[in-house]
Design a protein with these regions (language model features):
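Thiol/selenol-based redox catalytic cores and closely related redox-interacting motifs
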Residues: 90, 97-170
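Structural microenvironment flanking redox-active thiols in thiol-disulfide oxidoreductases
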Residues: 50-104
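N-terminal "domain-start" segment that seeds a small globular fold
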Residues: 1-29, 49
Length: 184
């Protein structure tokens, strides 16, 4: 993916502060590459699968010099921490965005019926929920918007270096491939 400036986003980046450390994304990404992961709602098995996948490869990503920041829609840190701990991804930098302002700033919208409820979503949902054991629960205000689509962005020195925009709710990105764009 070609590098492109994100002047319109830099203001938003400064406003995106982590719940746990109070740092903002603009400063973080100036110092080291950041893998910014926008999650679906915590009740979604695909969201839980993403947290699990990232937890498994976190040491490799961080050893390569990247910082991982999760963006979620839960209004309180306790809800997010519960899920991050469950998947051994705590402590982790995370940003609460219950109004989905940052999701919109990065071009992540709400999914259409076909993106969320197509046959492959049901098949992958069974795989993730039952076979992999991630479970699920109904969307609620405390865990996020059930129609929100996720995405992954690699940010560094004021630019988006790479991105993975989910076309379907069940897409399972290769996070290691996504960060390879910026190997230090």
């Amino acid at each position: 993916m070609p590098e492109y400036p994100v002047n319109s986003l830099t203001t938003v980046w400064r406003e995106m502060t982590t719940v746990n450390s109070g740092e903002n994304i603009a400063e973080m990404a100036q110092n080291q590459p950041v893998m910014l992961v926008f999650l679906r709602h915590f009740g979604c098995s695909f969201c839980r699968e993403a947290i699990f996948d990232i937890g498994n490869i976190r040491p490799t990503i961080e050893q390569d010099g990247f910082r991982i920041v999760m963006v979620h829609m839960a209004p309180d840190a306790a809800t997010a921490v519960k899920f991050f701990k469950r998947y051994k991804l705590y402590p982790i930098d995370h940003i609460a965005d219950p109004e989905k302002r940052f999701y919109r700033a990065f071009g992540l919208g709400r999914g259409a019926t076909a993106q969320l409820f197509g046959l492959m979503s049901w098949i992958r949902g069974f795989e993730s929920t039952i076979l992999e054991g991630h479970g699920m629960s109904a969307p609620s205000e405390e865990i996020g918007d059930g129609f929100q689509m996720p995405g992954v962005f690699v940010l560094h020195k004021g630019q988006i270096k790479n991105a993975f925009i989910h076309q379907m709710s069940h897409d399972r990105p290769d996070y290691l491939e996504i960060v390879r764009c910026c190997e230090l």
